[in-house]
Amino acid sequence: MPTPKKGARLGGSASHQKKILSNLAASLFEHGAIKTTDAKAKALRPYAEKLITKAKSGSVADRRNVLALVPNKEIVAYLFNELAPKFENRPGGYTRIIKLENRKGDNAPMSQISLVLEETVSAEASRATRASASKKAAEEAETEEVVEAPAEETATEEAAEEK
């Protein structure tokens, strides 16, 4: 049996916290981004990412597990059929938390948690761009050296002529 989480819970009780996270995850999958408090966003991130990882596998058992946690068939179907294929090449980090201004009424710290749907740049592509950039920089440095070398010689020649 897992040990209970220490500290304050969202909503007061364990069952209320589970429902809050379930509803926040459903809203996140439905809208793509939601605005909530920092504490809820930080608690939602691992919860939602585990659901997306289960959706990526696509097995019937995982679908039933997700349906037990998010009791909305339409959202679970959307998660498995449309969102999971978008995250197929991404090994993790499906969500992003952006800090916002504090809430006006009670000055609570607010955040926007959103799904990261942009394509990731592979390590090979970034390595290739870095290599090409370093080659260009090396070529530019060589051309600058070639241009600077005659200029220095002419300066020393002019100094010799003046003497």
Curated annotation (Swiss-Prot):
Part of the 50S ribosomal subunit. Contacts protein L32. Pfam families: Ribosomal_L17 (PF01196). Belongs to the bacterial ribosomal protein bL17 family. Gene3D superfamilies: Ribosomal protein L17. PANTHER family: LARGE RIBOSOMAL SUBUNIT PROTEIN BL17M, RIBOSOMAL PROTEIN L17. The gene is rplQ. Keywords: Ribonucleoprotein, Ribosomal protein. Residues 140-163 have a biased composition (Acidic residues). One of its GO terms (biological process) is translation. GO terms for cellular component: cytosolic large ribosomal subunit. It comes from Corynebacterium glutamicum (strain ATCC 13032 / DSM 20300 / JCM 1318 / BCRC 11384 / CCUG 27702 / LMG 3730 / NBRC 12168 / NCIMB 10025 / NRRL B-2784 / 534). Residues 123-135 have a biased composition (Low complexity). HAMAP family: Ribosomal_bL17. PROSITE patterns: RIBOSOMAL_L17. This is Large ribosomal subunit protein bL17. Residues 123-163 are annotated as: Disordered. One of its GO terms (molecular function) is structural constituent of ribosome. InterPro entries: Ribosomal_bL17, Ribosomal_bL17_CS, Ribosomal_bL17_sf. It comes from the Bacteria.
